Every structure is written in structure tokens, then in C-alpha cells.
Amino acid sequence: MIPRKRYGSKNTDQGVYLGLSKTQVLSPATAINSSSDIAPLPTPVALVPSPPDTMSCRDRTQEFLSACKSLQSRQNGIQTNKPALHATRQCSEFTLMARRIGKDLSNTFAKLEKLTILAKRKSLFDDKAVEIEELTYIIKQDINSLNKQIAQLQDFVRAKGSQSGRHLQTHSNTIVVSLQSKLASMSNDFKSVLEVRTENLKQQRNRREQFSRAPVSALPLAPNNLGGGPIVLGGESRASRDVAIDMMDPRTSQQLQLIDEQDSYIQSRADTMQNIESTIVELGSIFQQLAHMVKEQEETIQRIDENVLGAQLDVEAAHSEILKYFQSVTSNRWLMVKIFLILIVFFIIFVVFLA
């Protein structure tokens, strides 16, 4: 059998592949010897094994820890901001309540001005009694409602006083006292208007009684109405007496009608005066409630006044101490001499050693 001669790394003989197998690996020495003897042939791309897919790893533990810390700090910040948000919400509720009370006070003041204009009229023929009574009733109801609202506002401030700061509580108490003073001033004005109305009613009644006519009992009746007639004609006399009552003198009937009108007018005026008196009594009770509320605020105001006085004394003491220190510094001549000597020494050192 004739041996076959190898001419290279691969040879074909009768369709047989004699080159390297896909799994065969050459050693470095063999590869060098073979490369020195035989020119290397380009390796087919399809035969080169693809490198294995490797995933690059990176330690991101610190990033995870920093993200956890940032999230925890955000949650802590939200928790710390919750009291501030709660205080802001309480402040907004208090502001809305105070604004509503102030608006109601302004509306009631406008009604009171209108009532004042109507109550100061002294004419008998331009007396709008119905409108005055309606305004009086409305203003009285408004004052009662405002008194209740201010009491609720004070209770709200008292309930939330422990949760809010000292300055916020002081501000709230100041607003409550201001609203109470405005309500007291308006109630006092309303009371004075009612007193003016009462005086005008008394003057109108006196004027009306002065210019009214005499009552019917003082006027003589017609003799026909009181005359008797014969005893025999008793029935006819009674009939004529009945007819005489029906057929009165026109002047007497007008006087009776005028008396009825006067009675109704006097009764209406008496009712009006009773309403005014009851309103004044209710205003007195409102004044007592306001006085009690102001008395409760008196301790807070006194405490604020004492704190202001203490702060003023501290400021004055600090100012006096600063003046003393300034005088001691300005009068200390040795300090100026020492500073001058130090500057001279530094100048000499700089000129002699550094120049």
C-alpha cells in the first residue's frame, strides 16, 4: 500500500477531508512549527466558535442603600410636616370662621344705619312703624347669632390652643377680642337707637293727645235721645229710644270712631314700646355675656402685657450694658497703644526679614 504524502493542513483525496477536525486544538509549539513550514490558510468564519455570552456584574448595593435612605428621609419629612400641615389647616378654619363673622358684622352695621335713619324721624305722618319693627327684629336676631358664633370661635381657639404655637394662639385671642369689641359697640349703638325710638314714640303720643278732641263722655247728648215720653206710651218710647241710638248725631259717631282709632294706635305703640324694652333687656344679657368673655381674655392680655414689659426691661438693660462696654472700649487707651505697637512690630518684621 502506497503511503500518502501530506502537503498541508488539509488535503482532499477522492472526496475525503483530511484537515483538522472542528474539535481538534493545536498546541502552541505545533502551531509555530506548522506555521513555519506551511503558510496558514484563512479560517472560515463559519468554523470559528463564537465566544460565550458573559454578563458583566456590578455591585449596586450602595445605590440600593442610598435609595432606601432617601425614601426613609422623605417619609420622615412627611411625618414631621404633618403637625405643621395640621396647624395650617386649623389656622385656615379659624380664618374662615373669623371672616364669616366679620362679614355678618358689616351687614348688621348696614342694617343698623338704616334703622337709625328711620328711628330719628319725628313726623307723625312719615312714621314707618312696620319697617322699623322688622329691622329691629332682624338686627336683634343677627346680634344673637353673632354672639353665638363668637362664643363658638372662642371655644375653637380654646380647644386647639394646646396644639398651636404661642404666637398663633395670641393672634387668635386678639382677633376674638376685636370681634367681641365690635359686637359690643354695635349692641351699644342698637340700644341707643332703640332709646331714641322710645323717646320719639313718647313725643308723638303727647302731641297726639294734645291736639286730639275731647272724649265723648264730656259732650252732652241730644235731649231726644234721653227724653222719656208718657208712661202710657212706654213701648213706643223704648222703640224711639232704640231708634235714637241707631240714629245718633254724626259728630258723636265720628268721635267714637276717632276714639277707637286712638285706642288701636295707642295699643300698637304700647306693643312697640314693650318690644323695644324686651330688646333692651336682651341686649343687657348679651352685654353680660360679652363682659364674661372679655373677663376670660383679660388674663391672657395681662400676661401678654407683662411679657411685653419684661422684654422692654431686658432690652433697656442690654442697651445700658452695651453703652457701658462701648465706653470702656473707647476709654481704654492702652488698647490703642497695644494695637499700634503690634502693627509696628509686624511692619518691621516684614521689612527686615522678608524684604
From Swiss-Prot:
Listed GO MF terms: SNAP receptor activity; SNARE binding
Entry coiled-coil feature ranges: 287-318
Membrane association type: Single-pass type IV membrane protein
Record topology, Cytoplasmic segments: 1-333
Topological domain spans for side Vesicular: 355
Annotated localization: Endoplasmic reticulum-Golgi intermediate compartment membrane; Golgi apparatus membrane
Main localization category: endoplasmic reticulum
UniProt entry keywords in alphabetical sequence: Coiled coil, Golgi apparatus, Membrane, Transmembrane, Transmembrane helix, Transport
TM region(s), chain numbering: 334-354
Residue intervals of the t-SNARE coiled-coil homology domain: 263-325
Motif IxM motif, residue numbers: 245-247
One GO process term, biological-process aspect: regulation of Golgi organization
InterPro entries referenced in this protein's UniProt entry, alphabetically: SNARE, Syntaxin, Syntaxin-5_N, Syntaxin/epimorphin_CS, T_SNARE_dom
A single GO cellular-component term on record: cytosol
Keyword Hydrolase appears in the UniProt entry: no
Subunit and partners: Part of a ternary complex containing STX5A, NSFL1C and VCP. Part of a unique SNARE complex composed of the Golgi SNAREs GOSR1, GOSR2 and YKT6. This complex also includes VTI1A. Component of a SNARE complex consisting of STX5, YKT6, GOSR1 and BET1L. Interacts with BET1L. Interacts with BET1. Interacts with COG4. Interacts with GM130/GOLGA2. Interacts (via IxM motif) with SEC24C and SEC24D; mediates STX5 packaging into COPII-coated vesicles. Interacts with VLDLR; this interaction mediates VLDLR translocation from the endoplasmic reticulum to the plasma membrane.
Family: Belongs to the syntaxin family.
Protein name per UniProt: Syntaxin-5
Encoding gene (name): Stx5
